[in-house]
Amino acid sequence: GGCSLQHLSYDGQLEFKRNQVEETMKRIGKLNVEVPETLGMENPWRYRNKSQVPVGFVNGKLTAGFYQKRSHAIIDMSTCLIHNEQGDFAVQKTREILAKYGTEPYDEQTGKGDIRHIMTRFAHTTGQLMIVLVTTKERMPFKEEIVRELVEQLELTSIVQNINPHKTNVIFGDRTKTLWGKDIIEDTIHGIRFAISARSFYQVNPIQTEVLYQQAIDAAELTGEETVIDAYCGIGSISLCLAKKAKHVYGVEIVDQAIQDARANAELNELANTTFETGKAEEVIPAWYKAGIVADVLVVDPPRKGCDEKLLETILAMKPKKVVYVSCNPGTLARDMKILTDGGYVAKKVQPVDMFPMTTHIEAVTVLHLN
């Protein structure tokens, strides 16, 4: 599994993460900023709203669990203490039902078999639960019987099939169909409703997502008069939380399906003061700038590799009053902050947030003010 800090007390984990951020700011960014205590969870267990569990044969029996470290050998798993209970229970029941009907797990070596992964998604605020069966082909022996038993034995909102016929380590294929119930489940963050499909990007720790986004909302200090640009906006989760308090929010994201989800979520919440566009942030934002769209507040929530150099150049040319940076990698955060501070911005503090207790992952939020 991925719980490589589980041997530390939870207070020890939070301090470890704070030290990591502080040390990285000094070493890579040459920045002397305040790094307060990591914002952790009251209960750091059972927080994950999504599980993706590979299925295989172990000792001639169908099983589902984790990959052994540095291999694709499956270790049988009866429970995972960071998965929410509903999803955990659903994985076990699904595994039992698949075994009962003699479903053949996918074999990476031969390319044969029917079932590749069991995935669950749970909506923290509504209690809605989705099961996704990732199969090698659309036809699967006893599919109707398996679906019927899942519905009888679990409290479900949705059962979805994803078809992935390719010899690949990528979990999902291109085709998805709903076998029972709704196409989506619905959750809320800061009172904003989100429709989540099998393949939607959505933060996996709903409790700490609210903590993380509150840091970003507080840092933005919106009055209702500001134009906000959200680079790397995903399905619009930060954008829509900010749209309640901004004049207009523009979001950009490279994944077209995420932009379609963002637009649908804006409509779901009747937030007409939003514009979402598919494309690279480093290409779309300069085009907006040329068209006269200038941000008062610019929000970035980039992938682990950090912000593209061209985007940082555009920020320095556009000169928004504030840059709110939400980071999942202290190293690239420190690097990008160094570029922005060399270009006239000032940062006083970097706030670590523990989104993934028991793991080494660290999220952090900072605000850079134009000097």
What do these predicted ranges mean?
Residues 1-105, 125, 140:
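Extended interfacial segments that mediate partner engagement and assembly in macromolecular machines
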Residues 37-44, 108-109, 116-121, 352-355:
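Short, solvent-exposed loop/turn elements at beta->coil junctions and helix N-caps
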Residues 46-52, 61-63, 115-119, 128-130, ...:
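Broad gene-expression machinery/nucleic-acid interaction feature
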Residues 55-57, 122-124, 354, 370:
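Short, low-complexity Ser/Thr-rich regulatory SLiMs
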Residues 56, 120, 127-136, 193-197, ...:
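Short, aliphatic-rich beta-strand segments
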Residues 65-68, 132-134, 262:
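Short, acidic/hydrophobic/Gly-rich beta-strand patch recurrent on exposed beta strands
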Residues 104-112, 228:
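Short helix/loop segment immediately N-terminal to the Walker
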Residues 142-153, 157-371:
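Rossmann-like S-adenosyl-L-methionine
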